[in-house]
Amino acid sequence: MVCGCSALLPLPNPRPTMPATPNFLANPSSSSRWIPLQPMPVAWAFVQKTSALLWLLLLGTSLSPAWGQAKIPLETVKLWADTFGGDLYNTVTKYSGSLLLQKKYKDVESSLKIEEVDGLELVRKFSEDMENMLRRKVEAVQNLVEAAEEADLNHEFNESLVFDYYNSVLINERDEKGNFVELGAEFLLESNAHFSNLPVNTSISSVQLPTNVYNKDPDILNGVYMSEALNAVFVENFQRDPTLTWQYFGSATGFFRIYPGIKWTPDENGVITFDCRNRGWYIQAATSPKDIVILVDVSGSMKGLRMTIAKHTITTILDTLGENDFINIIAYNDYVHYIEPCFKGILVQADRDNREHFKLLVEELMVKGVGVVDQALREAFQILKQFQEAKQGSLCNQAIMLISDGAVEDYEPVFEKYNWPDCKVRVFTYLIGREVSFADRMKWIACNNKGYYTQISTLADTQENVMEYLHVLSRPMVINHDHDIIWTEAYMDSKLLSSQAQSLTLLTTVAMPVFSKKNETRSHGILLGVVGSDVALRELMKLAPRYKLGVHGYAFLNTNNGYILSHPDLRPLYREGKKLKPKPNYNSVDLSEVEWEDQAESLRTAMINRETGTLSMDVKVPMDKGKRVLFLTNDYFFTDISDTPFSLGVVLSRGHGEYILLGNTSVEEGLHDLLHPDLALAGDWIYCITDIDPDHRKLSQLEAMIRFLTRKDPDLECDEELVREVLFDAVVTAPMEAYWTALALNMSEESEHVVDMAFLGTRAGLLRSSLFVGSEKVSDRKFLTPEDEASVFTLDRFPLWYRQASEHPAGSFVFNLRWAEGPESAGEPMVVTASTAVAVTVDKRTAIAAAAGVQMKLEFLQRKFWAATRQCSTVDGPCTQSCEDSDLDCFVIDNNGFILISKRSRETGRFLGEVDGAVLTQLLSMGVFSQVTMYDYQAMCKPSSHHHSAAQPLVSPISAFLTATRWLLQELVLFLLEWSVWGSWYDRGAEAKSVFHHSHKHKKQDPLQPCDTEYPVFVYQPAIREANGIVECGPCQKVFVVQQIPNSNLLLLVTDPTCDCSIFPPVLQEATEVKYNASVKCDRMRSQKLRRRPDSCHAFHPEENAQDCGGASDTSASPPLLLLPVCAWGLLPQLLR
């Protein structure tokens, strides 16, 4: 290895004879001394920033070096370190059985093969397997499209149709008399492991409707009746491909048919807000990519409720956009201004960050002046023209959204100059408010520019009216009958199901549009809806088996926009109190924000361009929640996945990751050793396929493997290569069980307090463990269980103890302090985990075969340490010094500066820099430790309050009263206006309910917001085995000695506590937010990262019926109810004047 933890940690061999070391202590101008073990490894050149000469110049002192050495004798400290290290090494090798395990693998070296991994061949194989899997999902969706269009073709609309169906909300509901409610018949539900253990019905689908859609509307009843034909196809698809998950049909009228059928639970207010037409998969499948400029009227006539509705309309439009769309928003009154000045003259990608940024700015819009529409229209047309000519943006649909309370003219000269006769830019008009005086001109603008006109009178009107523009944009695709297949970005559909198991699963959806094939409606381009199916990304990534990628290797996926679809370092959740919540931008994390060492973005560019190839990078890999770092050289292999917008990457680390170990043994011998009770397999790895046959789903991987090997189940499919490696490892590691058992039987009562457990893991995911204490006495019960993901083999990673040991010289141990986290485990004793790697060498190639270790109580380690430091080199008489003396402070720290042992228990587990900043600062200047800056582009920070000044004037009682009164009146106004048109919304059914989108209310701001942070990690330089120094602390000088503890990643640090060095601030390992000034922030926001556009575009069709362009809504309402809100708004300015 040229980099990695092997460079962080000491070699296990005794120190070789070194040439005479320069005695810096002989020079009174110097007060520190260092003893190099050997020349620094080349790979550490970028870490070792401070030379010995530099710290030598920094450490001038008048203190006599002889006094410092006498204060803390180097020989004594070395004796303590060697004694403690020797005792520790003997204990961990004895109880882990690491020497025996190494011998067992050594004995079979002659039968082993170590092959070099061909990364390109590997990534191509994984890609083909993923392509085949995804193709089956596409075929299932195509079957649904054909069935839905055929059913519609054979269905005649019946205005008076009466039809009962399974309503997802009402199924199994009973009234007071015990009878099933209407649309709520008995519906059998059974828990199903394949569907996250949710109660489902795999025989039939159920139908969900949002609260604001009447469940007996003739359009709904006819659509539900027609789509009953999908039930048979749902079941047939699932039988043909049992790996399918949810299949569904989202109708353009608003109902959502989902298979398998489920019970849908309203929210705490009894409201169903889920509307399939708002989902990304529906919108992407229904339309092609688009460039949109929103023009919003902010003249004085838009004050009050009109502005509130306009803001909500903009927010709703923004919610219909995705990563393939581009957007800008212009506000106009007497003059034209961009609501984000940084975006002047351009369009920006409608990713989540930009959409949310626009929403915040929209809320701050103020009204004044007179509206000048023609200037705004000219500005919008010019932006769209410039982007089209520069080959930027979506290069597909272009549209202008005009949001106003009216237009005083038709602006024909503007359209004649910029848009006629081709009408390449569609214009959609939204008339805000109940006034209809300007309706004709607003409709004329839309109808003469291939757009659509709607009138929005209330907040509750917004959703349905905004959605009309999507149906217009879908017309060319519908007329052409082009069934484009779309794949979404990664998402957690917590709105689909209120189940935690579902909401925390990252999915991608494949979807296709469903069209009306009836000849009489061909020119209208009627979209019936969208069908789709979910693919759990975990299932997709199982096709890149973990065991083929080495200890540090991994596979990842990204999209055509450069966003991560799946990556081990993608952290989509954050903790808020006791709850885990999705980060706001979890599905728009760019590849360059995870693989941030790729400064030139060469990897990102190649993958977006669908290239097949390889490149190498030196990387710093954070571990253990960012407290530690590995230095690796990674080889990246990448290719595309055909017929999808995705690209696949595979990472192999240089050194161990380049090779794969292949062993062989007989099935009979291996089977015998598989049956040992101490053996387990990686729970997330796929040894055998158990999710196809329902009879296999209850089997563990170990049970399935045994049935496969004994031929009890000929239908079982298993990974024969992986099974062979498991059998081999089972045979080689079998003697460990007898070894550990013998140790446990021979343990005395005193030795029972030494080690809690021993364990080992192999590169095939095999785990063995043995307890040396009763299970009730185990200190860390989560260790080696799924509750502690870092300690077990997962789909993404090898265990932390395995990864650390593999980068440490084989035979020496890595010690990690562990303590149970969370309030439920408060007070549990701390434990220490020690692990070592077992390496095998064949034909000069070395591979890591396994890692073994022990877990012990910290208390045992402390006892060993204090006993070791009572020894001294004096032959006769008692020792003159001990670490227990009041004039000495002794610490045992690890190679990242964390304290394992201290006199003060409160310091255990803390970073040395927090406890003694002076000494750590000196160690950094001496080069004993180096500081590495790491970056986190997925962090969450407390938002800064930049909207309001912190120095607010005192609020008078009258001002407070008026503010409260204004708020109450606003709420009353909005409430009455929404409810005043109850009858006109749903005059077809009194059972209809409304759902209101209160975007005008201030949303509760999350306490944390996405941000970029940087944080330091401190790394010991193993070339320096021992060093001493003096810190100038004003009136006194602090002496310290640091000594490497052999065969470990530990250091003994002895300091003089009598000198107060509080003038040195603590050195913290805390993350700090990276702040960007306005200019840099604007440049970052304006930058257009490389992306690949979707392959298809449907912008226009000559047969399109452009005269179907909307009409005025029926806005009749109760005059008395309308009068009060209008008066209230009129009174507000006077009341608050």
Curated annotation (Swiss-Prot):
Organism listed in the record: Homo sapiens
Tissue: Predominantly expressed in certain types of endocrine cells. Present in the Paneth cells of the small intestine. Also present in the erythroblasts in the fetal liver, in the cells of the zona reticularis of the adrenal gland and in the basophils of the pituitary. Present at low level in some brain regions such as the cerebellum (at protein level).
Residues involved in a divalent metal cation binding: 297, 299, 301
Connected disease: Retinal cone dystrophy 4: Characterized by minimal symptoms except for slowly progressive reduction in visual acuity.
Name of encoding gene: CACNA2D4
Domain of life: Eukaryota
Coiled coil: none
Name of the featured protein: Voltage-dependent calcium channel subunit alpha-2/delta-4
Membrane topology annotation: Single-pass type I membrane protein
UniProt-annotated glycosylation sites, renumbered to this chain: 201, 664
GO terms under biological process: calcium ion transmembrane transport; detection of light stimulus involved in visual perception
Keywords: Calcium, Calcium channel, Calcium transport, Disulfide bond, Glycoprotein, Ion channel, Ion transport, Membrane, Metal-binding, Signal, Transmembrane, Transmembrane helix, Transport, Voltage-gated channel
CDD domains referenced in this protein's UniProt entry, alphabetically: vWA_VGCC_like
GO molecular function: metal ion binding; voltage-gated calcium channel activity
Domain Cache: 487-580
InterPro entries xrefs: Ca_channel_alpha-2/delta, VDCC_a2/dsu, VWA_N, VWF_A, vWFA_dom_sf
